[in-house]
Swiss-Prot record:
Binding site for [4Fe-4S] cluster: 39, 42, 45, 49, 70, 73, 76, 80, 116, 119, 122, 126, 145, 148, 151, 155
Annotated PROSITE patterns: 4FE4S_FER_1 (PS00198), 4FE4S_FER_2 (PS51379)
Record GO terms (molecular function): 4 iron, 4 sulfur cluster binding; metal ion binding; oxidoreductase activity
Pfam families membership: Fer4_10, Fer4_7
Name of this chain's protein: Uncharacterized polyferredoxin-like protein MJ0514.1
InterPro entries: 4Fe4S_Fe-S-bd, 4Fe4S_Fe_S_CS, Polyferredoxin-like_ET
Provenance organism: Methanocaldococcus jannaschii (strain ATCC 43067 / DSM 2661 / JAL-1 / JCM 10045 / NBRC 100440) (Methanococcus jannaschii)
The entry's keywords: 4Fe-4S, Electron transport, Iron, Iron-sulfur, Metal-binding, Repeat, Transport
PANTHER family: POLYFERREDOXIN PROTEIN FWDF (PTHR43193:SF2), PTHR43193
Domain (4Fe-4S ferredoxin-type) ranges: 30-59, 61-90, 105-136, 136-163
Length: 163
C-alpha cells in the first residue's frame, strides 16, 4: 500500500521500487598504545592486567600489549606512573533515513528452466500470484513479484534462486 502511494505521487508507477527502512549503525573501535619514550618498565601494568595481555618486549626495555587479548579495562593506564599507556576509543555512528530506490528485479531472480520439473508448487504457494504457467515451465511476473523468497524456499529442485 505504501509503495503504491509513493509510486503514484513520485511518478514511479511503471518502476519497481523498494523501500529501505531507517537504520542506525554504531561502530566502536578501541586502540591501546604504549608511549615508549615515557615507559620506565616498572611492571605495574603487567601485574595488574587481568587477562595477561601485557608483557615485556623481547629486549626487556619496554612493555608490549597483545591487542587480541586486551579487554581495554583501563587498569594498566590507571597504575602507570608516567602515563605511558594511552587508550583510544573511537565511535562512529551512521544514521540513514528511509529511502526509495529503484530495483531491477531481474537482477535478483534466477530461474533455471532446465531444473524445473513443472510441479507448480511455486505457483500454488506464491503469496503475490507472481508465477504463472508458461508452456511446460513457469514464468515470473516481475511486476507482481515482491522478492519474498517463498518460491525459492519451496522449490524442491532449486530452479528459482534469489540473490
Amino acid at each position: 500500500m505504501i509503495k503504491e502511494i509513493i509510486a503514484k505521487h513520485f511518478n514511479l508507477a511503471d518502476k519497481n521500487i523498494q523501500l529501505l527502512p531507517k537504520f542506525n549503525i554504531i561502530l566502536n573501535k578501541r586502540e591501546i598504545i604504549v608511549k615508549e619514550d615515557k615507559c620506565i618498565s616498572c611492571g605495574k601494568c603487567i601485574e595488574i592486567c587481568p587477562v595477561n595481555a601485557i608483557t615485556y618486549s623481547s629486549d626487556g626495555l619496554y612493555i608490549t600489549i597483545n591487542k587480541e587479548k586486551c579487554v581495554f579495562c583501563g587498569k594498566c593506564k590507571k597504575v602507570c606512573p608516567t602515563n605511558a599507556i594511552v587508550i583510544i576509543r573511537l565511535r562512529c555512528e551512521i544514521n540513514e533515513d528511509a529511502r526509495i530506490i529503484e530495483v531491477d528485479k531481474y537482477e535478483f531472480i534466477d530461474y533455471i528452466s532446465e531444473r524445473c520439473a513443472s510441479c507448480l508448487v511455486c505457483l500454488r504457494n506464491c503469496p503475490f500470484n507472481a508465477i504463472e504457467e508458461y508452456g511446460s515451465k513457469i514464468r515470473i511476473d516481475i511486476n507482481k513479484c515482491e522478492l519474498c523468497g517463498k518460491c525459492e524456499e519451496i522449490c524442491p529442485l532449486n530452479a528459482i534462486i534469489l540473490r
